[in-house]
Amino acid sequence: MGPAIASQNKIIELVLAGANGFRLNMSHGSHEVHLENIKIIRGAEKKLGIFLPIVADLQGPKIRVADLKDQVIDLKTGEQFAIADRQKVKKAGMKIPNNFIPVEYPEIASDVKKGDILLFDDGLMKVTVTSVKAPFVNVMVMNGGILKSRKGINLPNVKVSQPSMSEKDKKDVKFAVEQGVDYVALSFVRKPEDVLHIKKHIAKLGGKQWVIAKIEKPEAVSNIEDIVKVSDVIMVARGDLGVEIPAAEVPTVQKNIITVCNRYAKPVITATQMLESMINNPRPTRAEASDVANAVLDGTDVVMLSAETSVGTYPLETVSYMRTICSEAESHCKQDDMRIRRSTMGLPRKEHNTDLIATAAATIAENPDIAGISTLSLSGETALLISNRRPNTPIIAMTEFAEIARRTGLFWGVTGVLIDKAGGTDFTVEHMKQFLKKEQFFKTGESVVITIGRPLVARSRTNMLTIEQIP
């Protein structure tokens, strides 16, 4: 979300062009602005009669240059500078030196050592640490440039001591829970404990939001399997990741992360600079089209746009191109090969039958006589597991809860719908069939796979599969 699309009509246009959900970047804008955007999205949702997931993307422990008060710093190659947090310098009773870069990072002198590299503004400027004399870190400029206020700082291969959630993040999480957004994205995840910590924090606030772990640190790449196990969704955040690790490694790291997510049946989002040139141009480059297509072929569940739609000149065209590229890639993707690859990758089996039912549903749907799959779900888990098997047919996830219908918006191939609570098993199956016909998901006479959990009164896990004809 951003000023380029901040109206209900724009949101509706984007959804009709192919958008499935929207992200609020908590690094920018006030809670008042985000609240207005939430109202716009929910209004569009109501008009269209669909469910749109909203992601609150936390800033995280992002290290930044302090406010320079409308000034800039000219970093010239070979020059020496001192870096420190202003408050730390003040507490130490020391003077600010001439060549000084103020940063919002009190622990910088504790975390870095001689020889470490610091990158400014997404790696455009580079300095190396020559000495550390707390509270100052002395550096020499390797690659110069004009450094502006609030620009980001990356410390490749440095284990920073900042907590996974800042005070700002905690306020933003509280806002997200109060406003009922569907997902919370945690930035700069380093270890599984970071994810468990925010989950506990959300639960204390009474929230049930799923957590998206953003992978953008080398430490997270090293811990990827453990992070995936405890996360609900993973985001391959290639912006900071491509600064923290060599750019040449990003494609293979991306493929590995997606593979691990597929193995554990966790949705994965591929993000950042996917159609970057469309911020100012009405069509993407060939390389960008290939990038999006390859993410799809790798097995990503979601592809995400950022500045292209938030501040870009051609947001509608960008979404339209994205949808076309994804559809074209999937039309050439051998879904049966993808299912075989996933089923042989050692997917951890659940302690219940849901996993087996999901596999059976996707396998049966390979039959050309099957028009689709519909699952009655209280949590969305069955829909997610079926989605992971990549059937060739639509997946309709029916639920009593709007928040679950919205959650499924980030599941590959799944449409979430709200259905009234029904009685016994036979009545429920009939009710589902009538609903699918009424909403024109399927036609009279078409066969669909239906999964439910019985007994319904016990709200059991999915344990029943039936093949039914639409009346």
Please state what every model-predicted region is.
Residues 1-471:
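Non-catalytic helical/linker scaffolds that mediate oligomerization, partner binding
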